[in-house]
């Protein structure tokens, strides 16, 4: 189990780095990524700013079903500081339902900002960033044998994006990760984390999310990701956020460089569509949706009018029959008299 997890991680790192060195700032920063990783300059990149008045409601999007998240097994999970983020390897017994194919879990990782500065999440909703963001990475196991193979294919990956804000109380689920950060302070350090209920890392409301086609947010920026960004947020305490912002280093040796602001700048949406699994109060509709809604209302009113017409006609006919019956009975009584 441990060997296979380490092998998977090595393959993923090689695929992600491509033998090149990259950072978020400086001469190897994200402005220079396209020079070494051409796909980073393509037109379906992530993250994006999700504008809720421009999304398209899709009633066919079901609530996600995270299978096995509450029972991740008994084997310890590997936590690794790879110099870009802190990453937790996940067992393949975890998978997502509610997607076109079966996507099994591979790893999760975090993105965050730095103390005293706003922002830290990669995705934004209505131009509003949060302090951090959790990504849970899955790959299409129906079509591909490994994460590295799926990462290069359209919709080979399915990533859950959870925006994280600061709340008043400590989040016990996130503490299972954050309490071990001091064991992986420097790049390439690893430790083991006891298995825990991963479902509690997710928002309670899994039926409200946004869906779009995008990319990895780090080199090589493959445009292979079916993104699910939850509308509801998770919360951690300020103490937990500061631990995330101030514990890890992106370097192996002195002088140590604090691992902060490991989030990519927003990318243009271009011609892509963003779908929503729900209708927000006060949200606007597209022209097609408004036309469909208008036709639906018109047809509904017509059906109602027809129903009222036939009911009224039936009542009128019955009344006429009753009147004829009364007249006939009265005439018969007069004749007999």
Curated annotation (Swiss-Prot):
Residues annotated as glycosylated are: 213
Mind telling me which GO cellular component terms the entry cites?
apical plasma membrane; basolateral plasma membrane; membrane; plasma membrane
- Spell out the activity regulation: Activated by histamine, L-adrenaline, L- and D-histidine, and L- and D-phenylalanine. Inhibited by coumarins, saccharin, sulfonamide derivatives such as acetazolamide (AZA) and Foscarnet (phosphonoformate trisodium salt).
Topology check: give the Extracellular ranges.
16-290
Is Chloroplast tagged as a keyword? no
Annotated Zn(2+) binding lies at 109, 111, 135
User: How is expression of this protein distributed across tissues?
Assistant: High expression in all parts of the central nervous system and lower expression in adult liver, heart, small intestine, colon, kidney, urinary bladder and skeletal muscle.
Tell me its cofactors. Answer: Zn(2+)
Instruction: Print the keywords alphabetically.
Output: Disulfide bond, Glycoprotein, Lyase, Membrane, Metal-binding, Phosphoprotein, Signal, Transmembrane, Transmembrane helix, Zinc
Q: Which SMART domains match?
A: Carb_anhydrase
Q: Cite the GO molecular-function annotations of the record.
A: carbonate dehydratase activity; zinc ion binding
E.C. number: 4.2.1.1
Q: What is catalyzed by this enzyme?
A: hydrogencarbonate + H(+) = CO2 + H2O
Q: Which residues carry this modification: Phosphoserine?
A: 325
Q: Which PROSITE patterns match?
A: ALPHA_CA_2
Q: Which residues form the signal peptide?
A: 1-15
Localization (cell): Membrane
| Membrane-topology annotation of the record | Single-pass type I membrane protein
User: Can you list the disulfide-bonded cysteine pairs?
Assistant: 40-221
- What is the annotated role of this protein in its UniProt record? Reversible hydration of carbon dioxide.
Q: Which family does it belong to?
A: Belongs to the alpha-carbonic anhydrase family.
Q: What is this protein called?
A: Carbonic anhydrase 14
